[in-house]
């Protein structure tokens, strides 16, 4: 822990003593919280408020789609917001603005890329998404930050622009052949099943997954 610092990112970090939090704050070590993974795997409840009150830099991440189901940062933001509100026993335990910052500029800071990405600022890369505010789940559209954190989902994204290049436009991906991707993933799964069947022949489930 004493070797941590701004060039190290701790992922999860759900179980920390007050001494741990103090050290993380003093060394300016950023923490990346992945609430869906932490809940699903039983790592524990993500104590974002404890980190923030201690002055620890906090960002949000998906971790891995194998554990969280999909790469849905809207769901991650909503989970983080609702978990903290539940812990604080208050609808206003953490603001949507603060959660959105953790999902954007704070993540860029954690990676040392805040001079290039993370906010819509002249001179930074043109990385942005366009969200439809007229879809039924976004109505009535009121406070933008609240709607993005509490109501938005991937299907509302009209466009994705990365470094000025459209990767999604008019609601459709521009650089990926989804039909081919579906075929490739199906082939990969089938090969994995065949290999697993060969390896597992004559073995019990415990033997197969114990090295």
Q: Residue ranges of each PLM-predicted region?
A:
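Flexible loop residues that form catalytic
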Residues: 13-14, 85, 134, 165
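His/Asp/Glu-enriched, well-ordered alpha-helical/loop segment
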Residues: 2-4, 49-136, 150-153
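Short, flexible active-site loop motifs that bind/organize anionic cofactors or intermediates
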Residues: 11, 89, 171
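Active-site core of metal-dependent hydrolases
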Residues: 1-70
């Amino acid at each position: 822990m004493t070797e941590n610092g701004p060039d190290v990112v701790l992922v999860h970090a759900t179980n920390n003593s007050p001494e741990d939090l103090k050290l993380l704050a003093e060394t300016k070590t950023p923490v990346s919280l992945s609430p869906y993974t932490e809940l699903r795997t039983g790592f524990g409840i993500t104590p974002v408020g404890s980190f923030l009150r201690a002055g620890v830099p906090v960002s949000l991440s998906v971790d891995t789609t194998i554990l969280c189901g999909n790469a849905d940062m809207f769901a991650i933001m909503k989970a983080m917001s609702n978990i903290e509100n539940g812990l604080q026993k208050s609808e206003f335990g953490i603001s949507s603005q603060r959660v959105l910052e953790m999902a954007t500029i704070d993540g860029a800071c954690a990676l040392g890329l805040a001079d290039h990405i993370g906010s819509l600022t002249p001179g930074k890369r043109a990385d942005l998404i366009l969200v439809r505010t007229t879809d039924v789940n976004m109505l009535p559209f009121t406070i933008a930050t609240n709607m993005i954190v509490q109501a938005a989902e991937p299907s509302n994204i009209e466009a994705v622009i990365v470094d000025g290049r459209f990767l999604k436009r008019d609601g459709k991906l521009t650089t990926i052949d989804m039909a081919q991707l579906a075929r490739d993933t199906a082939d990969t799964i089938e090969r994995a099943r065949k290999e697993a069947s060969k390896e597992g022949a004559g073995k019990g489930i415990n033997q197969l997954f114990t090295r």
